[in-house]
């Protein structure tokens, strides 16, 4: 893999005791381009703005997907990436639904591990937080025709982050607006899913709430998921969570909680 390193790191300017989520970035980015037939080689270069043609299809039709996962330092100062394989698998499921090319799981796994190894000094201690990884793919054809792009770019950028929430949340039960519908793209981490949620989320925040608990599109009586997480509740000593279907994201943390709960006999 070709790696172009920055001439001067930004590491020394970061206050790891004050990490605002998603606003502080590491020195480099991982890139791989799809030319319409096959993926090129992964490479790493210094983080910088990307240039795009105004007719790039992603700007008009939203053919874009992403993932989110974290790397941590353990007690031995070794780096652990939480369930990277599962995130790559889910990314490819999103790609299929959005008519985008799948990534080679093994090559992608190795490339992301090399990228994280390069940026390991940006990983906070476990008391401070973690390194948030944002893999994403965008369509890059230059056309205003409403068709699937043939060319795509896959990238990974990273942010040292603190803890996303520092207090319990006030949750608003949303029964007017809907996040997703059966047969749609709710199970995919498609960029537009999140843009569509901003307006009702802001309405909830104006009422003093932190997050929305979304309900089903049919009658608003079936609980689905939160804006930034899957939903669990405990009743009569048992742990419950909505069944996964195509309007609910297949949460990797959700799956981890279920495995742990079963292991503990819950």
What does each of the following model-derived ranges do?
Residues 1-115, 136, 143-266:
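Helix-start/capping segments and mature chain N-termini
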Residues 124-134, 138:
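Extended, Lys/Arg-enriched charged tracts that mediate electrostatic binding to polyanionic substrates
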């Amino acid at each position: 893999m070709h790696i172009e390193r920055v001439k001067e790191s930004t590491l020394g300017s970061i206050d790891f005791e004050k990490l605002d989520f998603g606003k502080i970035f590491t020195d480099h980015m991982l890139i791989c381009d799809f030319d319409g037939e096959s993926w090129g080689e992964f490479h790493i270069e210094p983080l910088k703005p990307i240039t795009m043609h105004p007719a790039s299809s992603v700007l008009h039709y939203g053919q874009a997907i992403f993932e989110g996962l974290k790397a941590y330092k353990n007690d031995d100062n070794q780096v652990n990436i939480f369930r990277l394989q599962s995130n790559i698998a889910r990314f490819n499921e999103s790609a299929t639904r959005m008519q985008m090319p799948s990534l080679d799981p093994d090559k992608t796994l190795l490339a992301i591990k090399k990228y994280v190894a390069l940026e390991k000094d940006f990983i906070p201690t476990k008391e401070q937080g973690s390194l948030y990884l944002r893999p994403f793919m965008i369509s890059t054809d230059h056309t205003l025709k409403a068709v699937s792009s043939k060319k795509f770019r896959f990238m990974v950028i990273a942010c040292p982050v603190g803890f996303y929430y520092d207090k319990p949340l006030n949750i608003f039960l949303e029964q007017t607006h809907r996040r997703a519908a059966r047969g749609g793209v709710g199970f995919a981490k498609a960029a537009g899913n999140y843009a569509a949620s901003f307006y009702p989320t802001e309405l909830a925040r104006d009422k003093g709430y932190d997050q929305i608990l979304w309900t089903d599109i049919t009658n608003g009586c079936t609980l689905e998921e939160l804006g930034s997480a899957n939903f669990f509740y405990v009743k009569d000593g048992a742990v419950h969570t909505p069944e996964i279907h195509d309007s609910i994201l297949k949460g990797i943390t959700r799956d981890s909680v279920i495995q742990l709960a079963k292991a503990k006999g819950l």
